[in-house]
């Protein structure tokens, strides 16, 4: 089959230099170039398929590329298409090593057992963070004393040592061990190295910008007299937390002798104005190759920037656009910086019956340990005899209830209030019995408060914020990040009146997320990291605010990676791009992201008041009768009584018949 190539692609496919870096703009056809390069090597240069390896970063990408190569060029036999780890596994098997890869569940249990010594509850996020730090350390080529983990150094070292001890004792490997062993083997045994140098004459690497130090070391070892054909884009390097570095793209010609850079400049994916706007953003980065990027399409799509009052109105606007659109649900993607931001979108889509697909299928905001803790307090308020939730909260903050006493409560046979179990225990000191009784009364008191007041009472009066301070210090974690979870939880409860309503809402969200796992035709919800390499007709990039994107933890030394992340997000769009920057997030006023300003995105002002005035009485379909407190451009503030004040997009309410004036 004849494949049509543009001039940039032809130069990349047919060049005969030894070491080539193809710098590929988004949507520029890098997979087309790679499979055509392989075909050129086989048909024109008569290279044996056994002398070619094509390395990708995921098995799915490798399978897709192999399949396309075979189908496009009608081949029965293909060279190796696979990941670095897949290649290293094959090498070690060939050299006689017996390899058993450690199961993910076992890794989790090892780390959890270490972390459990420092905290009663160990979150999945914390386990993943430790395992990621272990991987980052092993691939960094640094000594242990030189490595700075993102958590407590003592906890990291203990976790690392226990993890390695278990693997060594049971003859197990992880993927990083495969990399380390192959490189060590090649360094120590020149005969084996030369064997593979003679075998791997042509090495092709996809997503070169994602290579870590160990992978670059391997490629350099394979490059003695062989050819390297690397394809990537430093502007899409968004995995520094895994050890990838854009510098390898920029300094390619210094690392690999005689290296030459070729640029794929035509974006075949996006409408012209989306390409032009994305260029305005990414040109502000310094760690990049200067390059020409241009759109193949001469058409302009819709680029809309909106600055709604808050995240709820943001969700309403997105819902209205999708509902009125002729596009299929699956052609829309809502993208965000962190998983937590999906919470408000899920709420809105659930209420408006818009089907969705969570790419991170296991994510539920209410599964975060902070949410579980606050919910445990509230459940205990509903049922003071609830032993499970009593055990969950009693030492958050630490209330000097020993592990033996916790076990005593857990195994107590009679159906008795857990507070009374400890208070009536003979060896419980009077002062502790008094404290337990006071805590019981405080928890029962939660039932008399409004939901928002009850949540705040748990955080402030019952000392949960003190527990979070201790947690942050112990695990070397940002207290601000933990407080963001608390504020998001408060936002989730906004509009609900009672503890029972909140508990029902949490169960409803859980059910909806479970249902979404079976949904085939739904709007895609994902972090920007999760959609790299994908494309959608319509992209909705939400919460484009300072301290969200760029994230507040990356405002200084990692600002270029944050800009790359924003760039990756907006370049997923084929037809239309919608960017939202709420004026408030979790009740706090926010500045519009600098990346929005760099891209020249501008909001269209909405000044229509639809004849509604302050103090008018209206009826909202969801909240009932209310009074207009204030109208400011498109934001209408309504008072529904009982202390419930809400802000909405006036245009959304009117256009969707959600609000009517009560005559």
Feature-to-residue mapping (PLM):
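Walker A/P-loop NTP-binding motif
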Residues: 32-47, 220
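A basic/glycine-biased coupling hinge at the interface between accessory DNA-binding modules
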Residues: 18-19, 25-28, 41-186, 190, ...
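Conserved beta-strand position immediately N-terminal to the Walker
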Residues: 20-21, 52, 262, 332
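Helicase P-loop NTPase motor core
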Residues: 26-34, 257-260, 265-356, 382-383, ...
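Conserved helicase C-terminal RecA-like lobe
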Residues: 377-589, 593-598
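Conserved helicase NTPase motor core
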Residues: 2-14, 18-22, 61, 80, ...
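Conserved beta-strand -> loop -> alpha-helix junction used to position metal-binding or nucleic-acid-contacting
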Residues: 76-91, 354-376
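C-terminal accessory regions
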Residues: 544-644, 648-650, 655-663
């Amino acid at each position: 089959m004849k494949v049509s190539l543009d001039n940039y692609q032809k130069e990349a496919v047919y060049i005969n230099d030894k070491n080539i870096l193809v710098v590929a703009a988004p949507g520029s056809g890098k997979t087309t170039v790679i499979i055509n390069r392989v075909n050129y090597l086989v048909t024109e240069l008569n290279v044996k398929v056994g002398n070619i390896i094509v390395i990708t970063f995921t098995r799915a990408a490798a399978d897709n590329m192999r399949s396309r190569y075979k189908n496009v060029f009608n081949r029965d036999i293909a060279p190796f298409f696979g990941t670095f780890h897949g290649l290293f596994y094959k090498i070690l098997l060939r050299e006689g090593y017996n390899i058993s890869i450690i199961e993910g569940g076992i890794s989790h249990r090892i780390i959890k057992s270490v972390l459990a010594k420092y905290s009663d509850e160990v979150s999945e996020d914390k386990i993943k963070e430790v395992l990621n730090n272990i991987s980052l350390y092993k691939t960094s080529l640094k000594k242990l004393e030189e490595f700075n983990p993102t958590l407590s150094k003592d906890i990291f070292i203990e976790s690392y040592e226990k993890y390695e001890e278990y693997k060594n004792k049971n003859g197990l490997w992880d993927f990083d061990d495969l990399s380390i062993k192959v490189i060590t083997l090649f360094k120590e045994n020149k005969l084996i190295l030369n064997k593979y140098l003679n075998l791997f004459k042509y090495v092709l690497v996809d997503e070169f910008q994602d290579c870590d130090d160990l992978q670059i070391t391997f490629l350099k070892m394979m490059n003695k007299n062989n050819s390297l054909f690397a394809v990537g884009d430093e502007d899409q390097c968004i995995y520094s937390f895994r050890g990838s570095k854009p510098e390898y793209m920029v300094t390619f010609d210094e690392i690999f002798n005689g290296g030459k850079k070729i640029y794929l400049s035509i974006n075949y994916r996006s409408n012209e104005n989306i390409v032009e706007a994305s260029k305005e953003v990414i040109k502000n980065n310094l760690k990049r190759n200067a390059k020409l990027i241009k759109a193949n399409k001469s058409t302009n799509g819709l680029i809309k920037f909106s600055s709604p009052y808050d995240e709820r109105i943001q969700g309403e606007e997105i819902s209205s656009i999708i509902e009125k659109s002729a596009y299929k649900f699956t052609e829309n993607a809502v993208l965000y910086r962190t998983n937590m931001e999906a919470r408000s979108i899920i709420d809105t889509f659930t209420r408006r019956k818009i089907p969705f697909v969570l790419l991170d299928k296991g994510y539920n905001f209410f599964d975060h340990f902070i949410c579980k803790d606050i919910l445990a307090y509230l459940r205990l308020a509903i049922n003071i005899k609830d032993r499970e939730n009593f055990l969950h909260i009693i030492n958050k903050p630490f209330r000097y209830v020993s592990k033996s006493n916790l076990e005593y409560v857990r195994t107590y046979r009679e159906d008795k209030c857990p507070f009374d179990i400890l208070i009536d225990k003979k060896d419980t000191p009077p002062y502790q019995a008094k404290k337990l009784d006071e805590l019981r009364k405080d928890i029962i008191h939660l039932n008399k408060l409004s939901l928002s007041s009850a949540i705040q009472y748990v955080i402030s009066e019952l000392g949960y914020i003190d527990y979070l301070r201790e947690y942050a210090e112990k695990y070397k974690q940002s207290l601000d990040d933990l407080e963001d979870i608390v504020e998001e939880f408060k936002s989730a409860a906004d509009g609900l009146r009672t503890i029972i309503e909140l508990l029902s809402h949490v169960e409803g969200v859980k059910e909806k997320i479970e249902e979404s796992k079976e949904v085939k035709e739904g709007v895609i919800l994902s972090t920007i990291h999760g959609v790299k390499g994908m494309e959608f007709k319509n992209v909705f990039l939400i919460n484009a605010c300072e301290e969200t994107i760029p994230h507040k933890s990356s405002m200084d030394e990692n600002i270029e990676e944050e800009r790359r992340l924003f760039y990756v997000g907006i370049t997923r769009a084929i037809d239309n791009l919608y960017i939202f920057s709420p004026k408030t997030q979790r009740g706090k006023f926010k500045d519009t992201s600098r990346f929005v300003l760099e891209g020249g995105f501008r909001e269209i002002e909405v000044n229509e008041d639809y004849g509604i005035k302050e103090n008018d009485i209206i009826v909202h379909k969801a909240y009932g009768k209310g009074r207009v407190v204030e109208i400011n451009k498109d934001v209408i503030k309504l008072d529904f009584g009982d202390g419930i004040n809400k802000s909405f997009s006036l245009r959304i309410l009117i256009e969707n018949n959600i609000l009517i004036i009560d005559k």
